[in-house]
């Protein structure tokens, strides 16, 4: 029996943010709607440690955040679930007799229960804050290797100034270099980040050549 590979050996030189990002596909039953991006956040649920999947409100709602009456899909279909591809933890039985091979599995996450109640969470201001989260649950956290973005050591020496270089992680048009690792798109801070008004709130404009599929 071959010993299962360890995360320390396989990922020693890998940027950990690559495992905080996740590629999404919104679905209406079996119909693929739109590719998108998201990331993991380690928090709590009902007082217990938990992982959350964070993406944009418009990805899960399937509606334009600025015009919520407008569906994003050309046929007007709204998502009933999303498909994500997750890295199996190395203690899972699928790794037995495998030689340093890493395995990913598709995981379907329903967005609504049988009575039509949403299983995802939005801001109290709904589409005005284009952010939504999905509780991944204990099963997913125990079976898959997840890295919360807040578990990656922060760079406290990074200044947020206009003109500074930034990178946007995601999956342009659903593309990935290796199964689920994101593409890093280079950009720059294009607005003054230290001026806040009632209109700008905490928004910062980023100048970058992004593509559809990087929402999230």
Language model feature labels by segment:
Residues 58:
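Histidine-centered active-site/metal-ligand motif
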Residues 18-26, 34-35, 61, 69-203, ...:
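Serine endopeptidase catalytic core focused on the charge-relay Asp
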Residues 55:
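Cytochrome P450 catalytic-core helices
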Residues 8-16, 41:
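Long protein-protein interaction modules used by eukaryotic assembly/scaffold proteins
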Residues 31-52:
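A conserved glycine-rich beta-strand in the N-terminal activation segment of trypsin-fold
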Residues 215:
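Conserved G/P- and acidic residue-centered "switch" motifs that form tight phosphate/ATP-binding loops
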């Amino acid at each position: 029996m071959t010993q299962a590979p360890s995360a320390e050996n396989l990922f020693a030189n890998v940027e950990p943010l690559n495992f905080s990002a996740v590629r999404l596909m919104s679905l209406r039953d079996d119909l693929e709607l739109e590719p998108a991006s998201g990331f993991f956040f380690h928090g709590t649920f009902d007082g217990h440690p938990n992982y959350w999947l964070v993406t944009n409100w418009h990805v899960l709602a399937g509606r334009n955040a600025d015009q919520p009456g407008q569906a994003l899909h050309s046929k007007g279909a709204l998502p009933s679930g999303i498909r994500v591809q997750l890295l199996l933890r190395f203690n899972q039985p699928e790794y037995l007799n495998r030689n340093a091979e890493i395995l990913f599995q598709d995981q379907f996450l329903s967005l609504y229960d049988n009575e039509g109640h949403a299983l995802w969470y939005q801001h109290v201001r709904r589409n005005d804050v284009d952010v939504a989260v999905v509780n991944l649950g204990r099963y997913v956290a125990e079976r898959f290797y997840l890295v919360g973005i807040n578990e990656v050591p922060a760079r406290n020496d990074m200044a947020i100034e206009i003109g500074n270089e930034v990178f946007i992680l995601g999956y342009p048009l659903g593309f990935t270099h290796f199964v689920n690792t994101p593409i890093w798109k280079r950009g720059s801070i294009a607005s003054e980040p230290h001026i806040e008004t009632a209109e700008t709130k905490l928004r910062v404009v980023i100048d970058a050549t992004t593509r559809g599929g990087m929402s999230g």
